[in-house]
């Protein structure tokens, strides 16, 4: 799935339509696997990122309209979990945090106000880095891991020269799966996955 459907069709002699069908089914299996996440425990980094066409002049970050917002949780030096969200409000982000992170975890975020009140809901070990004040790391207080994942994801998805919004979720989950298995033999991992859940 490193090639576009057109390139794969050209290499194999199979129609683009058939290749697309196979790719979609594979990505659906991968997405199901990615959604079977246990609650994260340990040192966790949280951040949001915006995916979509190049920015419109003057619009950046949280004000960028028309972009897909993705919220990410990364267990430091291990796995990432991503979720497409409608907004970056406190209610949205904290709902996901409560459902995916154990209370005694150490949480690191940037200074976004959507994270206000995490201590009030039981996350006592909560630390921030304030990017607005040019603070990016203070010892173990940083979100460099999740920001590294965003760079990896954007670079990987860029090679497709645009992804249909309806298909973005599946491509995102494939990227998440690849990142989480970056030290493994991806081919063997996919074979195990398909043995367990055939197409």
Regions of interest found by a model, annotated:
Residues 1-199:
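Residue-level recognition of single "structural anchor" positions
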């Amino acid at each position: 799935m490193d090639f576009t459907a057109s390139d794969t069709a050209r290499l194999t002699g199979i129609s683009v339509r058939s290749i697309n069908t196979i790719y979609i089914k594979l990505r659906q299996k991968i997405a199901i696997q990615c959604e079977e996440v246990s609650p994260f425990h340990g040192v966790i980094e949280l951040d949001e990122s915006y995916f979509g066409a190049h920015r419109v002049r003057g619009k950046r970050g949280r004000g960028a309209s028309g972009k897909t917002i993705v919220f990410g949780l990364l267990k430091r030096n291990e796995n990432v979990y991503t979720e497409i969200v409608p907004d970056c409000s406190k209610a949205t982000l904290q709902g996901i945090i409560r459902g995916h992170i154990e209370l005694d975890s150490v949480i690191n975020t940037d200074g976004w106000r959507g994270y206000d009140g995490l201590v009030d809901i039981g996350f006592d070990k909560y630390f921030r880095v304030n990017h607005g004040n040019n603070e990016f790391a203070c010892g173990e207080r940083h979100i460099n891991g999740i920001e590294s994942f965003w760079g990896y994801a954007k670079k990987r998805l860029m090679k497709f020269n645009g992804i249909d919004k309806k298909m973005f979720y599946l491509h995102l989950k494939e990227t998440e799966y690849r990142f989480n298995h970056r030290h493994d033999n991806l081919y063997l991992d996919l074979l195990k996955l398909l043995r367990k859940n055939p197409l």
